[in-house]
Amino acid sequence: MRKGLKRIGALLIAGIVVSAAFAGCGGSTAAGSSAAKSSAAAGSSAAAGSSAATKKTITVAATPTPHGEILAKAKEILAKSGITLDIKEFTDYVQPNNVVDAGEIDCNYFQHQPYLDDFNAKNKTKLVSIAAIHYEPLGIYAGKTKAIDQLKDGATIAVPNDSTNEARALLLLEANGIIKLKEGAGVAATVQDIVENKKNIKVMEFAAEQVSRHIDEVDLVVLNGNYALNAGLNASKDALTIEAADSAAAKTYANVIVVKEGNEKNEAINELVKVLKSDEIKNYIKDSYKGAVVPMD
C-alpha cells in the first residue's frame, strides 16, 4: 500500500515538474512573441518616422510660361530626392504675392526685384527674394506697323501699366529713338516723364497680361518675355528689338524666387533653388526658349 502511495506521489511530482516546464516554455514563447511584435511595431514606427522626416512638399505660385514650365522640369528632378513640388499657376501679377504673404503658399516665381520692391512698398508686405533664376528680355513687337522706322505721326504703342514694367518699356522705346525721357527718370519713369515725342506717339497702358491682346489694334506692343511666349511670340526671332543680354536690365530684371520674410532658410525651398540653378535646368531653358528666356549665373 505504501509502495503504491509512493509511486502515485512520484508520478504527481513528475507531472507537476513537467507541467511547470511546459508552462515555462509557454510563457517564454508568449513573451518572445510579444517582444517580436513590439520590436516589429517599433521598427515600423521608426521607418514611418524616417519616411515622414524625408518627405517634403513645396507649394509654389507661378505664371504658366515660362515659370510653370521650368518648375515642371524641376519637379521631375526634385522627386528623385523625395521632394514633392506642388505648382499653383496664376495669370496675374498680384495674387502670387498675396498668397505667399498670407502663408497659403511657400514661395513664388514670376517677378523681378523692382516689381517686388514696388509691391512691398504699396501693399506693406514683407516678401523677400532669395535667388535670381532667369531673365526675360523685354521686346518691341510689330502690330499694324511692321518696323520701328515705319512709325507714322500719331502711332500707338501698347505697354504694360505696372510701374516697373512700364518704366522698362519706356526705357526700351527711348533706347530705340522713339521717345526721350526726362534725365534721371530711370526705372521710375512714367509717361509723364516723356519730354520729347517727335511723332506724337500715343502710349497706351494695359495690364501686362493684356498687352498682347491688343497687338492687332495698335502699331507696336512692348511685351514681357513670358507674355510674348503666351502669345506665340519669341523674343529672339519675332521681336523688332529686345533689351541687350549684357545690359543693366538683364541684372535688374532677373526673375526671382520669393518667400515671406523669415522663410529664407527653409531647407526644402533652398533645395528647389539649388535645382533651378543647376546646369540641367540652365540647359533646359536654353534649349526650350532659344533666347526668349536666359538663365542667370
Protein language model regions, located:
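Short, well-ordered beta-strand elements
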Residues: 54-65, 83-89, 156-157
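Short, low-complexity disordered leader/linker segments with a strong preference
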Residues: 1-57
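A bilobed periplasmic-binding-protein/Venus flytrap-type ligand-binding module shared by bacterial periplasmic
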Residues: 137-148, 253-266
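Periplasmic-binding protein-like
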Residues: 165-174, 276-296
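Short helix-initiation/N-cap motifs at beta->coil->alpha
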Residues: 87-98, 186-213
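Alpha-to-beta junction loops
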Residues: 101-111, 155, 178, 199-202, ...
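A conserved helix-loop-strand patch within extracytoplasmic ligand-binding domains
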Residues: 130-179, 282
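Ligand-binding "clamshell"
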Residues: 118-130, 144-145, 217, 222, ...
